[in-house]
Amino acid sequence: KESSAASDVYKRQLTDSVIEMVEESGFPGMKVLQFAFDENEDSPYLTHRYERNCIVYTGTHDNETTRGWFRNLSQHDRNFARAYIGCEGKHETAAVWSMIRAAMSSVADRCVIPVQDYLCLGNEARINEPSTLGDNWKWRMKKGQLNETIIQKIYKMTKLYGRLVKEETEEKEKTEADREKISDK
């Protein structure tokens, strides 16, 4: 099935020695949530198997969008994914937002959500299909697609799961102000 092409290539490259090297290096591992839902219901990509030192993605530039991926799942895998991510809505957009919630609520130190997933777009917005020529790297977000409703939804979920990042400039300004107070004394 097409939706598993990128995951099959990626998974084949993850030999025991590669996994061991990543663990020894201290670099964060990469967890692609779409890879969790295949015939293996004991997948290391399921969020309850994550360690903190990893980066979770709903999908990457080489994957289908989450909506496109969900549409192409087998009925068995779709049912398992819905049950695992707690998706009660029947519409594909409910599944996309449930995947985003699953990624954000995981223990992973970092979480990356492609904008196409926030916009609940299908595979017409896919970035790259590996080993193919043609329309790769051509998708562009249109002005106004990321509207205030979506921005607020992203903000609320990001805040809920403790993933808001303080601006470095705010921290830097506070530190500089504190130094000035000390030097004035």
Predicted feature residues:
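Single conserved hydrophobic/aromatic residue that forms the stacking wall/gate
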Residues: 1-6, 10
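A broadly tuned preference for mixed-charge, low-complexity surface segments
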Residues: 9, 56-69, 111, 116, ...
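Conserved alpha/beta catalytic core and glycan-binding cleft of carbohydrate-active enzymes
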Residues: 11-123
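Structured C-terminal cap/extension of enzyme domains
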Residues: 120-170, 176-185
